[in-house]
């Protein structure tokens, strides 16, 4: 029965994601999004999955985009899979010391525990890694689970192949080019988001836990959430490369699940890569795309009740 369910979900996703876009007002929405993408001064990948079968729209959906910290979402899935199996517990203690609280990287945990020498729960570690995108927390989790390969193997075991996870945060800081080895296609990331929320790859308890952790994300609020009404529920994970010495930004990403006023949801992944635009412009790409989808759905809902 489990074998049948997994393969039914995979078959359903193949049909869903290989379909042409059939959004309400699909032509106008695609035109709108393409006009937004044109201002990126770089490569943009977009995948949108609505709440009705065949409600899809993709732009560069099969392209390879560096994930940066978006890869902390599949890492969290892999950790929680092990929690569900009883190997880990959210209450178990993880020791922090100065050796695993590296300097010169984004780490709210290091700011909170500058001298190390403390034990924190896996819950606190995972929350900091996802909600606050803590880089040290990320690499501690990779060591806990057995390395990047273990996470990649788990994601591939779900039937999602177009995601590569080969380098830790510390390794990405060694050389600018290394970040490109951690990549995903927008379509694959949407497939993973779908399986997370609807595909029962985690227990209900673990799914709800991670969903709430992602809702509490504090990084880059001006991307997916930037133009949505205050209080809109968005479970998301950002990824950012910063800019190199030439002003090139390898990754300005945000992926997540947006809840509409009527309680329905749509899934969206936006990757902005190799852009020469400034940070405000790059962030606005995601904000304007998700707002266009939001307005499209709300207009459709309004017209259905005229």
Where are these regions (language model features)?
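Bacterial Sec-dependent N-terminal signal peptides
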Residues: 1-27
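Beta-lactamase-like hydrolase cores
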Residues: 22-63, 242
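Structured C-terminal helix/loop/strand segments within mature extracytoplasmic catalytic/sensor domains
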Residues: 25-36, 143-144, 148, 191-223, ...
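Acidic helix-start/capping segments at beta-turn-to-alpha-helix junctions
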Residues: 51, 90-109, 145-146, 213
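Active-site SXXK
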Residues: 54, 66-96, 268
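Conserved catalytic neighborhood of penicillin-recognizing serine enzymes
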Residues: 101-139
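Mid-domain, small-residue-enriched loop/turn segments at the edges of structured enzyme/sensor domains
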Residues: 118, 139-201
